């Protein structure tokens, strides 16, 4: 494939300035300075060409097998990321809008402290969330201040939660334009509308009369309003009509179009997210009507801004349509979708479609890195930067927003600097790619190429989901169909993978062919058959103990069980996230999967010896 390159950065000898990450000033944004910083953030985003982001969550996985690994298809990878995103909370959101001009990288780093505070007393954004002890320990070691997070963290609502919150606030909602119902009116509808029309007519006439000079004293006027049920909405007269159903709401709104010149209908929401009343407000003139609607919209806008909190920044990023650079696309954007957009869909295709509507251009830095250095691991940013030292890629970093610098203790670092490192790594990768091509002259060309070549992770994820191919760039990688994978568990004795392979070779003729063994966690292992056929033979043998003999019969008698890749996919799809994979596979075998979207198409897996679980890390 012809490679298109992204950068107009010039690589001039002797023009390199190296900045230690501890010297980068990252603006820390908390609840106390959030609103006064919003305009500055919007300006930084608008003036930049790219946006780097990095999240710090309260955890990433609850068990070893919950981590995305080489054996996962895009769908199972997404389900694992979805489970983590719904389980753990974002405590820090590092954002770094940046621009590239020649060898100069201009960054605007911010680090937002978040905490899901239930300010509306309605269980949103979250009643509770999970924490991973090792993650919190690491954050404390880095100097993370949990007191600031809890007391000064910025709260937020997702777009879906904001829509729901309108029904929980006490502010009436301006009724939308009415469309006449297509269903025929019943006798009960006709009687109801006639009664309400008469009531509104009398009330409206009293409002008109009260506006003109009459001989009535204040007492008589008050009694008349009391009899007609007239109330005050601010300085304006209003009438509240209680309703029992949304059908009655529709009928009242249709009827009120007869009085649209001087009557404005408002909906009074109930806590059950329905409508409990329609409030009609009398307008003294057309100018008064226009002013009233503007007041309502301003009030709604201010209320929405108050409850959405940090999501205002997410909306800035989305509306800018700038390419977003992420170190870990799947983990970051499942968390962003769950916390700031709405509930995560059940499959990766719907997720990609939903995400692309908000963030159409996403640069997956891990994939970009593998094009330059296929054997590199980008999970550690300093290590990834070091792996590029063999390339001549000078980048000068200039921090544009110098306000609120962070003084770091020795050994401590601000999470906000991760986003700066991501932008710097991206710039270096662009410089390396560009070195093989003629110089691209303009930054506009740079943006266009970025969008074409590397900023379509959302689309490519959806395409890969259809093919169900896992691409793992690692040494000694071999592609294998998911039909040739077998999960085994219930091993009576603890043994290494090499010893288990040796035992299996002596247990059944099927193991005379080439195969491999890897542990997934402490409870289960996976058999990789490099040819088609042996996996079905082995599973058939394990499930028919009477036909077995020798050591394999003894292993089955001691509790050995086996299942194909479809059982693993079913466990992920049905949410059997037990601590041990063996328990999840047992539940999946016992369950009846009636999911119509379940996919039985075989998948291809890239297998790598380097991606085995290291039990020392568990």
Swiss-Prot record:
It holds the Pfam family CAF1. It comes from the Eukaryota. Its cofactor is a divalent metal cation. GO terms for cellular component: cytoplasm; nucleus. One of its GO terms (molecular function) is metal ion binding. It catalyses: Exonucleolytic cleavage of poly(A) to 5'-AMP. Its EC number is 3.1.13.4. Its main location: nucleus. A divalent metal cation binds at residues 54, 56, 332, 418. 3'-exoribonuclease that has a preference for poly(A) tails of mRNAs, thereby efficiently degrading poly(A) tails. Exonucleolytic degradation of the poly(A) tail is often the first step in the decay of eukaryotic mRNAs. Belongs to the CAF1 family. This is Poly(A)-specific ribonuclease PARN-like. It comes from Arabidopsis thaliana (Mouse-ear cress).
